[in-house]
């Protein structure tokens, strides 16, 4: 199957955005496409069942972008994990903040650069990063992400990553669409010395906002 795309128009942070994403989640690059641009770019090391997930603009990612569009991060170094289409990173970059977008699928980095160009902003730096083999040159002031608790093991992996990558004075912000592993994540965070505040932005819906910081 040849990879197909579509453009999505939306308003976030007081401006309109044109975002290129996969036309559907039932896609994977052909061998010809991999060879034409290089397997590293296409994320050939990612399983077919997971590969398209990094190319879709999910509701939790839109909510994360809306949140960071209204918050201040002057002088802070920000990392978005599991960025996918990385709308939040694009919004932060458009506001002049120091942000790095990261994902285990290098294809996300290609979309990031294309969407930055579509919206006439500098492309945020992209870092290929996974929970299992994280690379952190120095800790971050702020770590953000959306729908990062998609598997049972993610609760421990994300917590361990925060211990490694978040400054003692730093904070994390995650948007979760209602995954069953949030309670385990909260317990794991508390055991590791973190505090976690959970907010339901819309009454009656499952989506949650998690704000995390280290105990003093």
Where do the PLM segments sit?
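S-adenosylmethionine-dependent methyltransferases
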Residues: 1-216
């Amino acid at each position: 199957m040849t990879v197909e795309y579509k453009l999505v128009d939306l308003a976030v942070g007081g401006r309109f955005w044109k975002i290129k994403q996969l036309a559907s989640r039932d896609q994977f690059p052909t061998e010809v496409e991999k060879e034409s641009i290089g397997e590293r770019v296409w994320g050939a090391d990612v399983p077919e069942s997971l590969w398209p997930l990094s190319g879709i603009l999910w509701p939790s990612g839109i909510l994360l972008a809306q949140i960071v569009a209204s918050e201040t991060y002057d002088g802070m170094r920000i990392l978005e994990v599991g960025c996918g289409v990385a709308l939040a990173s694009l919004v932060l970059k458009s506001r002049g903040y120091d942000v790095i977008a990261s994902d285990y699928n290098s294809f996300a980095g290609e979309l990031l650069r294309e969407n930055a160009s579509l919206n006439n902003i500098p492309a945020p730096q992209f870092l290929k990063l996974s929970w299992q083999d994280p690379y952190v040159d120095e800790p971050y002031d702020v770590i953000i992400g959306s729908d990062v608790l998609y598997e049972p093991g993610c609760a421990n992996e994300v917590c361990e990553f925060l211990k490694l990558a978040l400054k003692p004075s730093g904070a994390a912000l995650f948007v979760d669409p209602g995954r069953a592993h949030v309670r385990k994540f909260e317990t794991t965070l508390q055991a590791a010395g973190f505090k976690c505040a959970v907010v339901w932005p819309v009454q009656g819906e499952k989506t949650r906002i998690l704000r995390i910081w280290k105990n003093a």
